[in-house]
């Protein structure tokens, strides 16, 4: 890492923002979490419905799906609610599909049974990394929803087969860095979002050069940073869920 690097936040190149996962944040949902990555704050809820989409009828398996949204003043300037505009943006659709894919990657859908877990991720304050924060928090909310089903005797075993978490990395002022905030994300040379399982498998890698192409060496460095950061996030998930020894 470049010792002369000066990140706007003062963090080291390989340093996460302060991350917090607060469980049972809302009253009604089977699982709910406030996830905080520095100044990025997202409420993630997991709601159980005893039905599945039409395309899964008679298949004997469950489903996880996600919706994502931002409050009008989650950013520096107010934006209209998508409901008021009458349609979702392409960005919103992309992010909520990503969240759903990430969670389904670590669920045994047959073990879930013919029911759906709806994940709702609502950004109340955005400072970069909202999609990766949403995935990391949504897993904890989904885990609590599964615990509710187990306690009610609706599941014979947990359908969760592994943890999943996500983080952003990028090349900022020529140096690979971990967990971009908005000040870095808006000025970085390369931006990458990485989703991984607790076992170290890759679920998704989204990488884009913002003008200057990145090298294979830089990509490897970014993936190494992401793997390290996600390892820390998975351990935090285990800690807040009381699974320290899992």
UniProtKB/Swiss-Prot annotation:
GO terms for molecular function: 3'-5'-RNA exonuclease activity; tRNA binding; tRNA nucleotidyltransferase activity. InterPro entries: ExoRNase_PH_dom1, ExoRNase_PH_dom2, ExoRNase_PH_dom2_sf, PNPase/RNase_PH_dom_sf, Ribosomal_Su5_D2-typ_SF, RNase_PH, RNase_PH_bac-type, RNase_PH_CS. Its EC number is 2.7.7.56. One of its GO terms (biological process) is rRNA processing. It is an enzyme of class 2 (transferase). Keywords: Nucleotidyltransferase, RNA-binding, rRNA processing, Transferase, tRNA processing, tRNA-binding. Phosphate binds at residues 91, 129-131. It holds the Pfam family RNase_PH_C. The keyword Phosphoprotein does not apply. The keyword tRNA-binding applies. It catalyses: tRNA(n+1) + phosphate = tRNA(n) + a ribonucleoside 5'-diphosphate. Phosphorolytic 3'-5' exoribonuclease that plays an important role in tRNA 3'-end maturation. Removes nucleotide residues following the 3'-CCA terminus of tRNAs; can also add nucleotides to the ends of RNA molecules by using nucleoside diphosphates as substrates, but this may not be physiologically important. Probably plays a role in initiation of 16S rRNA degradation (leading to ribosome degradation) during starvation. Homohexameric ring arranged as a trimer of dimers. Belongs to the RNase PH family. PANTHER family: EXOSOME COMPLEX COMPONENT (PTHR11953), EXOSOME COMPLEX COMPONENT RRP41 (PTHR11953:SF0). This is Ribonuclease PH. It comes from Burkholderia multivorans (strain ATCC 17616 / 249).
